[in-house]
């Protein structure tokens, strides 16, 4: 994956509304189509949406998630397996423009609707906000 927060400040991409269902809770977020987001599911080759960690916090209140928890996704993985086994959480390797890489917590939501169409993809949760000014909460790879 190659997405960098500094590069996002120069975005001119399209925004879209995404409705996702996680742990039985439905949330609508704004996503940016980001051609620089090349993160793929290593098992299927499918697209991965990168989202703010706060989406996971809001949909899974039983985790009592804090931003500092996202710095160690390995530890959070076990907590998620116990509290929300149906989400089938996993770790996803990534690399950014400004970072050598690491692991992101990822899971497959029950449902994702993009422009009214149901999609199947993983959501990986960023330990920092993906938007430079709060205009969106997620990144979708490719173009609309």
Label each residue range with its predicted role.
Residues 18-21, 25-35, 68-144:
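Aspartyl protease catalytic core from the pepsin/retropepsin fold
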Residues 50-76:
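Long, charge-rich C-terminal accessory regions
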């Amino acid at each position: 994956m190659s997405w960098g927060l500094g590069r996002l400040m120069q975005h001119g991409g399209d925004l879209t509304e995404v409705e996702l269902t996680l742990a039985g809770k439905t949330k609508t977020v704004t996503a940016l189509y980001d051609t620089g987001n090349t993160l793929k599911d290593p098992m299927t080759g499918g697209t991965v949406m990168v989202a703010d960690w706060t989406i996971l916090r809001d949909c899974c209140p039983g985790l009592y998630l804090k931003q500092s928890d996202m710095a160690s996704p390995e530890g959070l993985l076990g907590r998620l397996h116990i509290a929300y086994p149906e989400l089938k959480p996993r770790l996803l390797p990534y690399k950014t423009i400004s970072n050598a890489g690491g692991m992101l917590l990822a899971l497959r939501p029950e449902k994702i609707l993009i422009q009214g169409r149901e999609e199947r993809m993983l959501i990986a949760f960023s330990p920092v906000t993906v938007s430079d000014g709060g205009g969106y909460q997620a990144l979708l790879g490719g173009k609309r």
